[in-house]
């Protein structure tokens, strides 16, 4: 299995990190917090198997509108729990 980096700041792919689930990269797919690289901005994560996390917390279209979820933007038709929070 490929090591994806620092395991302490990673999580499995799911709607909470914005990666497709199941991830096309299999079990090696993880979301890493960019807080170290971006100087503490914890709302944005990157996924080796996808694009940016945080701004698109579920598998909704990237044509997003602001929602009440903390730091999240989701498409109009998005109904995942992360967007509803």
From Swiss-Prot:
Gene: MT4B
Compartments where found: Cytoplasm; Nucleus; Cell membrane
Protein name, entry field: Metallothionein-like protein 4B
Chain segments carrying region Disordered: 1-20
Major localization class: cytoplasm
The keyword Secreted is annotated on this UniProt entry: no
Gene Ontology molecular function, alphabetical: zinc ion binding
Function statement: Metallothioneins have a high content of cysteine residues that bind various heavy metals. Functions as a metal chelator of copper (Cu) and zinc (Zn). Plays a role in storing and distributing Zn ion in seed.
Protein's organism: Arabidopsis thaliana (Mouse-ear cress)
GO CC terms, sorted: cytoplasm; membrane; nucleus; plasma membrane
UniProt note on tissues of expression: Expressed specifically in seeds.
GO biological process, any: zinc ion transport
Highest taxon listed in the record's lineage: Eukaryota
Expression triggers: By abscisic acid (ABA) and jasmonic acid. Down-regulated by gibberellin.
């Amino acid at each position: 299995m490929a090591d994806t980096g620092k395991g302490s700041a990673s999580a499995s792919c799911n709607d909470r990190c914005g990666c497709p689930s199941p991830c096309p990269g299999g079990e090696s797919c993880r979301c890493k917090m960019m807080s170290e690289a971006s100087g503490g901005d914890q709302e944005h994560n990157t996924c080796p198997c996808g694009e940016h996390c945080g701004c698109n917390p579920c598998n909704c279209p990237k044509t997003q509108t602001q929602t009440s979820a903390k730091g999240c933007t989701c498409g109009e038709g998005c109904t995942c729990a992360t967007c509803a929070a």
